[in-house]
Amino acid sequence: MKFVATLIACGLSGLALAAPTATVDSLEKRGPNDAAFGYASLNGGTTGGAGGTTTTVSSYAAFTAAVSSDAKKVVYVSGPIKQSAKQVKVGSNTSIIGKDSTAVLEGFGLLVKEKSNVIIRNLGVKKVLAENGDAIGIQYSNNVWVDHVDVSSDRDHDKDYYDGLIDLTHAADYVTISNCYIHDHWKASLVGHSDNNGDEDTGHLRVTYANNYWSNINSRAPSLRFGTGHVYNSYFENVSDGINTRDGAQVLVESNQFVGSSKALYSTDAGYAVEKDNDFGGAKNTALKGTLTTVPYSYSLVGSSKVKSAVVGQAGQTLKF
């Protein structure tokens, strides 16, 4: 949507909610039936198409047909698929899994709208023109896990040539974005699309960003309105405007490292944050002090001094199925 604005665990768990330890848990899962962690683990959990039919696709036509229904299904993507087209609508109870690093969607993105229980994993999505929508858009939907994806465009064009990479809008809820490589883009990840949408969004937009590598981003890394965010174990490299909390959002920011940022963590229109063990790399935390000190799920922290080695080279489309 367009608006003016293998080391880390896929299932990091088992630690006390109030006092996660600064250790690395190497528990990365690689099976098609893995369940999500973070906010996507709540509200009944996110299992995607586990237990359903399995198919492998390698063409645009086969892909669009395979992901559309709400029946349980696991759809493997084999090789690159290139098509200039609007976002492909994804049905509920779906797992979309790239078989390896060649599984890249180019020119079109994915839309999860009014759906639930969706997993998008080990997939590349790149160079989706603004007229075709976001690379990954999540609207009016709950329980979505985006894991080990590589999303990008370029910064050779102006900021409106492409739209968002991963955008959550219209009361999307219980979402986890983990182990992703998010790079080479102007406006990366928007949570809450408008200052005027508080009536719909307040009480929703709960999202976890964990173990991600953000690189060469101008802004929205991420930008959160109204919702509740948890950003941890992530490495931010040459991200001009980083985490922007706004319009009453509450964000817990832990165990991250920033290099080359001008605004690492900041508020707009009364957004709030609590930060713990972050290396802002010379930039400042100017966010208003928040109240979100714990989250209702287990997780572990690697520590800001270890984030780069833990995330770079591991985040992104690095799995094989």
UniProtKB/Swiss-Prot annotation:
Required co-factor? Ca(2+)
One Gene Ontology CC term in the entry? extracellular region
Entry keywords, A to Z: Calcium, Carbohydrate metabolism, Cell wall biogenesis/degradation, Glycoprotein, Lyase, Metal-binding, Polysaccharide degradation, Secreted, Signal
> Which residues constitute the catalytic centre?
220
A Gene Ontology biological process noted in the UniProt record is:
pectin catabolic process
**Catalytic reaction list:** Eliminative cleavage of (1->4)-alpha-D-galacturonan to give oligosaccharides with 4-deoxy-alpha-D-galact-4-enuronosyl groups at their non-reducing ends
- Enumerate the GO terms in the molecular function aspect: metal ion binding; pectate lyase activity
Signal peptide range: 1-18
| Residues noted as binding Ca(2+) in the record, renumbered to the chain | 134, 163, 167
Q: What is its EC number?
A: 4.2.2.2
Task: Write one Pfam family the protein is assigned to.
Answer: Pectate_lyase_4
Write down the glycosylated positions.
Answer: 93, 238
The listed locations are: Secreted
**What is the free-text note on the cofactor?**
Binds 1 Ca(2+) ion per subunit.
Q: Family per UniProt?
A: Belongs to the polysaccharide lyase 1 family.
**General function of this protein:** Pectinolytic enzyme consist of four classes of enzymes: pectin lyase, polygalacturonase, pectin methylesterase and rhamnogalacturonase. Among pectinolytic enzymes, pectin lyase is the most important in depolymerization of pectin, since it cleaves internal glycosidic bonds of highly methylated pectins. Favors pectate, the anion, over pectin, the methyl ester.
Name assigned to this protein: Probable pectate lyase A
Organism whose genome encodes this protein:
Neosartorya fischeri (strain ATCC 1020 / DSM 3700 / CBS 544.65 / FGSC A1164 / JCM 1740 / NRRL 181 / WB 181)
Give me the gene this protein comes from: plyA
